Each structure stands twice: as structure tokens, then as C-alpha cells.
């Protein structure tokens, strides 16, 4: 593990950019960016266009290590190059710590939750991540209802995979998302915090994780997790809130920083001039940084 990157993620001021939409969500990501489905005719063309979009973001002067601590990439992005370097190396040279989304999507909903689908060949993927200079990983589950046993199952699955990732020398970001429209959201979050704490308490002293959580309904509901010795950092997803709304509620939660995806790129468009594109990206970065660092 790279100690300098570890220290930056643990103590740095800033947030983590999530650029990891995968195959299933790519057409929507492109559409939001102003690229219509009739502009590409197969997956290869689609992934080339999305790589162009991500390259435009990553190479923008606004996108630098001053306010952005890390960036989460999709597997295809990790394997491609930006200006002649693998994406992870390009980011690292900019002072941005690279992470890789490793999950293969969500299983069907059962008992009010969606577990992760199995991740075949995870060991090979982690080997490749190490070769590409990736620091950590991210994997997502989804919680829709307050079912204590099912929530515990989600957390247990996440930590089981996390231990494999730690053994490979990488830092896992564990993401059990709570749906922002869940009717017992606050109660779900209390049960989730309890389940996560129990798993954290069982980690060895040299096993570190990060957490990516929905911004809690009860302010500072996750403070105990943020302060846990086995947790490097706790980051928040925007989860369907607008950027303004996400920033507003994030600002109230001490020690919680952003890891926004859609809320970061929502004002960017393929038709914008570079000047306009960079200005909109800078604006988004500045407001998300502010909500992550300057607490209410």
C-alpha cells in the first residue's frame, strides 16, 4: 500500500469523485451528458464515448488533487489510457488517489435489500488493479426496507469480500446504500450503523476499510463509525438528491466527505466549449469541496 496515498485519503481536505457508472447505467450517463443513443451503434462505440467524457473530466484543469482526494473508476476506465498513461497512473500523477469499482451489480431484491451479485475472478481483477497502480476498491449493495437481519446480511457480505480485498493489498470502500426514499430511513441507518460497528470491531489492527454511506437523516448518525480506528474515511453518496440538497445536508455532518457521481457531473454537456465545461466542473468541485470541508 502507498503510504502517501493512505495519508492523503485519511487526513486530506477534499472529496472523492465517483466516475464509475458501469455498463448498465452508461446510456443514461451519456444521455445526461448530451449524447443520444442514436449517436452510437454498439457497446464498443458507447464505451469509447463514455471514455471520452471521463477523459474530458479527468484532464480538465479543474480536476486536480487540490480539492479532489480520490476518484473511483469503472473497470474499463482502469484498463484504458488517458494521454498515454493508464488512467490510474494519470490520476496519481495529478495527486488524485485511484479506486476501482469491483462489484458486478446487484442481485434481485429479497427481504427489502439487494445483495451484491457474486464477483467471479475477483482475485484476477485485484491483481490487475495492483498492476495498474490502483489504491482501493468500491462495491455497492442497496437497502430499501428496515429488516434488521437482511441489513446484517448485506454488511456481512460486504465485509467478507472486503477482507479478500485487504489481503490483496488494497483498501475497500464498503457501500451499503440506503435508498433516500426508504420509509424508515432513520431506523434503517441506526441498524446499519450497529451492524457495521460489529464487523469493524472484529477486524484486525492492520485491516482498514472505508465506508460510503447515504447521508443520514439524523445529523451525525455515523460519528462513531467515522471515529473507529479501522476506518480510514467515511464518504457520502448523493443518492438521488440534487447537488444543492446533497451539499446542504452533507455540510451538517461532521467528518463526512462527499463521494458524488451524478451530482458532480450534472451540469456538464458534450456541446459545451472547453472553457464553459471547465467552468461548470470547477463550480461543482468548489461547492462539493465546501460541503465536505467547511462544516455548518
Swiss-Prot record:
It catalyses: beta-D-fructose 1,6-bisphosphate = D-glyceraldehyde 3-phosphate + dihydroxyacetone phosphate. GO terms for molecular function: fructose-bisphosphate aldolase activity. It holds the Pfam family Glycolytic. SUPFAM superfamilies: Aldolase (SSF51569). The active site is at residues 175, 212. Its EC number is 4.1.2.13. Gene3D superfamilies: Aldolase class I. Belongs to the class I fructose-bisphosphate aldolase family. This is Fructose-bisphosphate aldolase class 1. It comes from Staphylococcus carnosus (strain TM300). The gene is fda.
Amino acid at each position: 500500500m502507498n503510504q502517501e496515498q493512505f495519508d492523503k485519503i485519511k487526513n486530506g481536505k477534499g472529496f472523492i469523485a465517483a466516475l464509475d457508472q458501469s455498463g448498465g447505467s452508461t446510456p443514461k450517463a451519456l444521455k445526461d451528458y448530451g449524447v443520444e443513443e442514436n449517436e452510437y451503434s454498439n457497446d464498443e462505440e458507447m464505451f469509447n464515448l463514455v471514455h471520452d467524457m471521463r477523459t474530458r473530466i479527468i484532464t480538465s484543469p479543474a480536476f486536480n488533487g487540490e480539492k479532489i482526494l480520490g476518484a473511483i473508476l469503472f473497470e474499463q476506465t482502469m484498463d484504458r489510457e488517458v494521454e498515454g498513461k493508464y488512467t490510474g497512473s494519470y490520476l496519481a500523477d495529478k495527486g488524485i488517489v485511484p479506486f476501482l469499482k469491483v462489484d458486478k451489480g446487484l442481485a434481485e431484491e429479497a427481504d427489502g435489500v439487494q445483495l451484491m451479485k457474486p464477483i467471479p475472478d475477483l482475485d484476477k481483477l485485484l491483481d490487475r488493479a495492483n498492476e495498474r497502480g490502483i489504491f482501493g476498491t468500491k462495491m455497492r449493495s442497496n437497502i430499501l426496507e428496515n429488516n434488521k437481519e437482511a441489513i446484517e446480511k448485506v454488511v456481512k457480505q460486504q465485509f467478507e469480500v472486503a477482507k479478500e480485498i485487504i489481503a490483496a493489498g488494497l483498501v475497500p470502500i464498503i457501500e451499503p446504500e440506503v435508498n433516500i426514499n426508504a420509509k424508515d430511513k432513520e431506523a434503517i441507518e441506526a441498524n446499519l450503523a450497529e451492524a457495521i460497528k460489529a464487523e469493524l470491531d472484529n477486524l484486525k489492527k492492520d485491516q482498514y476499510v472505508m465506508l460510503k454511506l447515504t447521508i443520514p437523516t439524523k445529523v451525525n448518525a455515523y460519528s462513531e463509525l467515522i471515529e473507529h480506528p479501522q476506518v480510514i474515511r467515511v464518504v457520502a453518496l448523493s443518492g438521488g438528491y440534487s447537488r444543492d440538497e446533497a451539499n446542504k445536508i452533507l455540510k451538517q455532518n461532521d467528518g463526512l466527505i462527499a463521494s458524488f457521481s451524478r451530482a458532480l457531473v450534472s451540469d456538464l454537456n458534450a456541446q459545451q466549449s472547453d472553457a464553459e465545461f471547465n467552468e461548470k466542473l470547477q463550480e461543482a468541485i468548489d461547492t462539493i469541496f465546501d460541503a465536505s470541508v467547511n462544516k455548518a
